[in-house]
Structures are given as C-alpha cells and as structure tokens.
C-alpha cells in the first residue's frame, strides 16, 4: 500500500488509501454522492482506467451490489467495460474502462444542439448498447446524457455507464420503485406501479434524442426548469413540442412521436426502433448485428473476476474502515436542488435525493 497516495477530496468523508502496487493516481475526474472517481494508470501495462471509490460501510448498499453484478455481465462496444473491484483499507474501488472523450452532455452543451445526422449517429450507438443490455435481461433505468460517455476517437464511440439503478429480470423482480432523473422518467414509472423497465428505457432514449436535436429537455418549462412538479405533470400529459427553429425530417418527428407515448403497451419498442427508417439511414455496418458486435469485443486481457470473489469483496466492504468519521461533507452531484425544493420537501410521497434523482416511497 502506497501511504503517500492518501488523499481526500470533495464527495468523501475520509481519505482514500490507493492500492499503489497496481494502479497509480493520475487525477480526479469527478465526485458525487457515491464518492469520487479517479483516472488511474495500471502499473502492469500503463493502461488508463477510471476508478470509482465508494467508502466502506453503509454506502456499500443494494444499489452498489446491483451495479457491479449487472455491469460485470455486460460486454459490448457501446458499454463502459467493467474490469474488477478492489478492496482498499478505506474504500471499495470499482475499476472500469476510461472514456477520454467525456460526457455526451458536455458535447451538446458546447455545441448547443446537434444536426439531425450527428444526433442519429449517437442515437444509433445508444440504441445498440441498450438493445444489448435488454438482450442480457438488464434494463438500465437511469439512461441520460450524463450517463453516456465518449471515447477519444475522431468519430466518437458512445459508451453507456452507471448501472447503479439497473435491474436484471433474471436476478431481480419487476421494477416498482421510481428511480431516475426527473426530466428522463417515463409516465408509467411516475405512477408507482410495476412497469416494464425495458419500455421505460425507450422513453429515456427518446428524451436523449430530443435533447440532442433541440438543446433543451422536452418536458421542462423553460421559464421554470427546476419546477419538478410541473415537469412531472407535463410528462404525464406528454406535453412537448419541437420548436420552429429546429428543422428535422418527417421520419425523425415520427420516431419521436412513437417514443413519447404515455401507454407503454403502444410505445415503440427497441426492436421496432432498430427497424425504423430514420434509424436505419446511414447505419454503420458494425451496428447492424449485436452478435457480431459482441464477438468483435472479445478481449485477450485478464479473465473476468469471478462472482464468488466479487461477492466476498462486497461482503467485506460493508464493514466500515477503522477510525472512519466525517472529514468532508458530501457535495451535491448533478442538479443544484437547494433553491426550488421547499415545496417538495413537504410531500410525504416524495424523497428527493441531493443528486437530483427522485425516489418515490412505495
């Protein structure tokens, strides 16, 4: 253990003790309710990886376990690759593929909005990754621009990340809780009944497509973007419009209209999206067949960490580090909710977490 690698930063209660024998710190790349994310370099081969550190103890909860188990099973070019988990004296470290291109969200913020062709280029990759997840019986449940990363290539490859809210129909029951970020949540999820997570993912993909094309969220009131109650009402009523200044093809409008359908039974499905004329236009050959993509993604690296080893590490990670105590307060991740949440605080049905994600009590 490299004691010189003891560090503390935002989003952490106690300093991280790195596994200095295997990875060396390059820099911090993010922080939030989960803890902190760091860019690290493998001492064995010099490869850059992203490492998500979560403090040992109570924070190693069901969401963390679900994220690791589901993420471990997924091997696809449009999904951030899970590598391994490591237990340090202070934290659980989740080692993942590093996407050097940053968030798709940042790219849109810089561009304002995308052309229809550019939006389609990224949407095709998003649907390819989501389709693969669903084929593995995993629904993501928190698809959003902030959870889609890009690699560093000239024509960036999109990478889905953050499986903390994902559910597997093999390992878990039908989704019932309301999770996700307000702007992306499907109507049936807000109704607090059992729902098909795969169809709910379709809605979230539609929100992502709309934001790429328009540069704004479809169901937010532009005058009151932080008014979540109004956003929720507009979602339930499917109240959206495409501004006059946004020029998109009739085929694109048709696809959006078939995604934004309140009744999940009549909403377009992922397989139907993949056969839609707008989606098929200029579709890269490597996105046409999931089986070919998966076979192309066989990696000659170290064998996958066994489930038994992972479960043992997770069990040990629930034991708090010796001498753990508050050094830093958590900093809010994502949306800044301080100003406009007073009216929601009094609602007994709502639990609005500081990350900007809404979880309805069941």
Curated annotation (Swiss-Prot):
<keyword id="KW-0723">Serine/threonine-protein kinase</keyword>
<keyword id="KW-0418">Kinase</keyword>
<keyword id="KW-0808">Transferase</keyword>
<keyword id="KW-0963">Cytoplasm</keyword>
<comment type="subunit">
    <text>Interacts with PP2C53. Interacts with PP2C50.</text>
</comment>
<feature type="binding site">
    <location>
        <begin position="29"/>
        <end position="37"/>
    </location>
    <ligand>
        <name>ATP</name>
    </ligand>
</feature>
<dbReference type="InterPro" id="IPR011009">
    <property type="entry name" value="Kinase-like_dom_sf"/>
</dbReference>
<dbReference type="GO" id="GO:0005634">
    <property type="term" value="C:nucleus"/>
</dbReference>
<dbReference type="GO" id="GO:0004674">
    <property type="term" value="F:protein serine/threonine kinase activity"/>
</dbReference>
<dbReference type="GO" id="GO:0009738">
    <property type="term" value="P:abscisic acid-activated signaling pathway"/>
</dbReference>
<dbReference type="GO" id="GO:0106310">
    <property type="term" value="F:protein serine kinase activity"/>
</dbReference>
<dbReference type="InterPro" id="IPR000719">
    <property type="entry name" value="Prot_kinase_dom"/>
</dbReference>
<feature type="binding site">
    <location>
        <position position="52"/>
    </location>
    <ligand>
        <name>ATP</name>
    </ligand>
</feature>
<keyword id="KW-0547">Nucleotide-binding</keyword>
<keyword id="KW-0067">ATP-binding</keyword>
<dbReference type="GO" id="GO:0005829">
    <property type="term" value="C:cytosol"/>
</dbReference>
<dbReference type="GO" id="GO:0005524">
    <property type="term" value="F:ATP binding"/>
</dbReference>
<feature type="active site" description="Proton acceptor">
    <location>
        <position position="142"/>
    </location>
</feature>
<dbReference type="Pfam" id="PF00069">
    <property type="entry name" value="Pkinase"/>
</dbReference>
<dbReference type="InterPro" id="IPR017441">
    <property type="entry name" value="Protein_kinase_ATP_BS"/>
</dbReference>
<keyword id="KW-0938">Abscisic acid signaling pathway</keyword>
<feature type="domain" description="Protein kinase">
    <location>
        <begin position="23"/>
        <end position="279"/>
    </location>
</feature>
<keyword id="KW-0539">Nucleus</keyword>
<protein>
    <recommendedName>
        <fullName>Serine/threonine-protein kinase SAPK10</fullName>
        <ecNumber>2.7.11.1</ecNumber>
    </recommendedName>
</protein>
<dbReference type="InterPro" id="IPR008271">
    <property type="entry name" value="Ser/Thr_kinase_AS"/>
</dbReference>
<keyword id="KW-0597">Phosphoprotein</keyword>
<comment type="function">
    <text>May play a role in signal transduction of hyperosmotic response. Together with PYL10, PP2C53 and SAPK8, may form an abscisic acid (ABA) signaling module involved in stress response. Together with PYL3 and PP2C50, may form an ABA signaling module involved in stress response.</text>
</comment>
<comment type="similarity">
    <text>Belongs to the protein kinase superfamily. Ser/Thr protein kinase family.</text>
</comment>
